[in-house]
Amino acid sequence: GTLLPSGAECCEALAREVSGSEEAFVALMNQKAAELEMQNTHFCNPTGLTELEHYSTAADLAKLLQAALQNPTFRTIFTTETYTSSATAQHPEGLLLVSTLLSRLDGTEFSDGAILGGKTGYTKAAGLCLASLAVVRGKEYILVTLGAPGSHATVQTNIQDAIQVYRRLQKKK
């Protein structure tokens, strides 16, 4: 639920499970940001939802994504289009979780590569955001875009922008 599709309540539960409290988890987040030299980032919550002193940049988030992709479990989740959970009493067939990025793509966005995974985001303050991973002409690229116009109910300009950037990389010799 934290990445597929996206759930603030899942982030909060994960934070409490890992660290005992959201505050302790946020301290770990800021410690990791310092280790990764994310100099323009300060976390206030585990969800990414708007708070006055909660901020980052596309460059810093790209550093974080690059580090996270080194973890095989994270990479698998980040690049998964759908996942069905184990059966429970409430969901005897399991619960279907769907990538908010990959579910919007059909694999024909560009000819010599593919968008492998990503995480969309939106708040009124931040606009449409996207952190994505693609392979273009055999090379992997990370792209983070922030502040695209629109909302969940509009055209996903953040995804359109990423496709255009990856297409330009494909044309580059």
Task: Report residues per predicted region.
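Penicillin-recognizing serine hydrolase domain
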Residues: 20-173
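Signal peptide-directed extracytoplasmic domains
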Residues: 1-4, 27
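Substrate-binding clefts and substrate-entry loops adjacent to catalytic sites
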Residues: 4-16, 44
